[in-house]
Amino acid sequence: MEKKTYYFVGIKGTGMAALARLLKDLGNEVLGSDIEKETFTQQPLADAGIPVLSFDPANLKEGMIVVQGNAFSDDHEEIVRAKEMGLKIQSYPETVEQVVANHTSIGVAGAHGKTSTTGLLAHVLSNVEQTSYLIGDGVGVGVADARFFVFEADEYRDHFLAYHPDYAIMTNVDFDHPDYFKDLADVKDSFETYGRQVKKGLFAWGEDKSLRDLNVDVPVYYYGTAPDDDFRAANIVRTPDGSTYDAYYKDQKLGTFTIHLYGEHSVLNSLAVVAVAYMEKIDLEKIKAELANFSGVKRRFAEEDIADMKVIDDYAHHPSEIKATIDAARQKFPQKELVVVFQPHTYSRLAAYLTEFGQSLSRADKVFVTPIFGSIREQNGSVSAKDLEDLIPGSEDIDQASITKLLAYHDAVVVFMGAGDIEKYEDDYKARLKERG
């Protein structure tokens, strides 16, 4: 890619910060602006030598390409100034597509499991081939002359329709983001449109009915555990140390693979990685070694030992994700009591899946529900945290003032789940736990 100067409006956003770092790695000049509030993306940007400025139209200079963050409207002062100056303005997805076009690219899509699968694929490929990658947990790495580009393709507001990758992985199709999609059929239509933009091949989870019905123009390779899947995991053994399985392509055994990750979804995610590597003729012995070395991505089953407790931080905010996270915790800690602190994320999502949230959370031994985290677009709604508690036997409400309730538990697992600001509850608990000892 020709070296350019990029100015990010909203550079502290998770995806924006990752993309900024990737473009900087590729030799471009990168800077941007955002609000004053401290974020976890700030230090990595500083480490990369990327200036983060306060909003000011005077920041803009001739020749800059302005990347407009999704949260910033056309009437934002810097966007207005950029238009007056005649600068090129493009979205995050449009900017990612420019990187996609210069590599053998693999876009990972799915209602759930995108970040975990992207992180796993990026880790594996980058240790066996030159690979650039962009992960939804805020990590972006650019490698000059890379063979591969691995990136997360988000379906929200149809952002992934900007992309035309060589390959796509589709982990599942589910009705999420009820503030944008009308129903499951609407979501499936978007995935199918994205699939038609893929150039070489598509890897899709075989048990997903919507993915089985895809009408696309490239070969679809199904992965899973069923006999009719193209790539199949068999003889799966799950223990507190992780999972081991035999991988097959059709009737051909590709090898025995081990991952130190938990839950059935982790087996499926790793099988998708094996499938991509096989189709690109990468040495599977190297893939085997790198799969065994992977420990996970940020905010996806991130563990910490404090006193006699296991504290887990997880991004789960949809019933399917909650079920998968609880399954993973049961696998790794089969003898321990499992306590979940859940922060509902947006009123519309809670209202759309209230019953399903109740069913998934009821798999834990004890559940505490925090106040609802509303989005910028949605600060209230017709549903309450109490409505969810009523569906979960023995559940209780909790907030920062009552976080000490959790100190009653010993030698147990506490999982903090949510996509909002659940960390504030987790940080309070950890501080109290360290005091308790």
Curated annotation (Swiss-Prot):
GO BP field: cell division; cell wall organization; peptidoglycan biosynthetic process; regulation of cell shape
GO CC terms in record: cytoplasm
Gene3D superfamilies: Mur ligase, C-terminal domain, Mur-like, catalytic domain, NAD(P)-binding Rossmann-like Domain
Family stated for the protein in its record: Belongs to the MurCDEF family.
Entry's EC annotation: 6.3.2.8
Disulfide bonds: none
Protein known as: UDP-N-acetylmuramate--L-alanine ligase
UniProt pathway: Cell wall biogenesis; peptidoglycan biosynthesis
Annotated GO MF terms: ATP binding; UDP-N-acetylmuramate-L-alanine ligase activity
Positions annotated to bind ATP: 110-116
Domain of life according to the entry: Bacteria
Main location (coarse class): cytoplasm
One Pfam family hit: Mur_ligase_C
Keyword Repeat attached: no
Enzyme class: ligase
Primary role: Cell wall formation.
Entry's localization field: Cytoplasm
InterPro entries: Mur-like_cat_sf, Mur_ligase_C, Mur_ligase_C_dom_sf, Mur_ligase_cen, Mur_ligase_N, MurCDEF_pg_biosynth, UDP-N-AcMur_Ala_ligase_MurC
UniProt KW keywords: ATP-binding, Cell cycle, Cell division, Cell shape, Cell wall biogenesis/degradation, Cytoplasm, Ligase, Nucleotide-binding, Peptidoglycan synthesis
Reaction equation(s) it catalyzes: UDP-N-acetyl-alpha-D-muramate + L-alanine + ATP = UDP-N-acetyl-alpha-D-muramoyl-L-alanine + ADP + phosphate + H(+)
